Amino acid sequence: PEDIGQSPGVPTPDGDKVDLEAFSEFTKIITPAITRVVDFAKKLPMFSELPCEDQIILLKGCCMEIMSLRAAVRYDPESETLTLSGEMAVKREQLKNGGLGVVSDAIFDLGKSLAQFNLDDSEVALLQAVLLMSSDRSGLTSVDKIEKCQETYLLAFEHYINHRKHNIPHFWPKLLMKVTDLRMIGACHASRFLHMKVECPNELFPPLFLEVFEDQEV
């Protein structure tokens, strides 16, 4: 709806507001969005071979990063909107007021910068695999195996990019910088989630949303 994020909200500790109506609308699409990240991970053979505990840590760590990437690559410069979960087009202020605060700016800025890369579905999938297989997540036991998995995806990614022959100078290192940007978005969201927990009624949080983000380190 066009008026999402426009009604009066609750002030949060970092100076912006949570529009509870907008927050409620966003939570309706969060569960299927998280489920799609899980489904993606399960399709990767190397992920399925990891211990269950490591799988959970990796999924919790990358979930916001991958959801942000999927939104960012659907940035429309003409309308200045992102499409969330493939169905909800939102403007920067709507996403900000719906609970994400400054994280909204980071996702929109990423969307603007990614537009020049013109990534295809395979490149987005490989980028998601690289984010998923991050061996520096706290608590992992199979660190070496996960690191080798990520290296495999990075090599495949670089090979595919060279095959596509993008016209942007230094395309590969510039794209890898976006991994750093997405990691920062994930870290910022972990902090924002604490604000959302304080400002929004608990019943508005879907169980899967809580399960994924409640125990993340800030």
UniProtKB/Swiss-Prot annotation:
Presence of the UniProt keyword Nucleus in the record: yes
Domain NR LBD: 1-215
Primary residence: nucleus
GO-annotated biological processes: cell differentiation; negative regulation of transcription by RNA polymerase II; positive regulation of transcription by RNA polymerase II; retinoic acid receptor signaling pathway; thyroid hormone receptor signaling pathway
Any one cellular-component term (Gene Ontology): RNA polymerase II transcription regulator complex
PROSITE patterns recorded: NR_LBD (PS51843)
Locations listed in the record: Nucleus
Keyword tags: DNA-binding, Metal-binding, Nucleus, Receptor, Transcription, Transcription regulation, Zinc, Zinc-finger
Pfam families in alphabetical order: Hormone_recep (PF00104)
Molecular function as annotated in GO: nuclear receptor activity; RNA polymerase II cis-regulatory region sequence-specific DNA binding; thyroid hormone binding; zinc ion binding
Domain comment (free text): Composed of three domains: a modulating N-terminal domain, a DNA-binding domain and a C-terminal ligand-binding domain.
Function: Nuclear hormone receptor that can act as a repressor or activator of transcription. High affinity receptor for thyroid hormones, including triiodothyronine and thyroxine.
Family membership noted in the UniProt record: Belongs to the nuclear hormone receptor family. NR1 subfamily.
The protein's name: Thyroid hormone receptor alpha
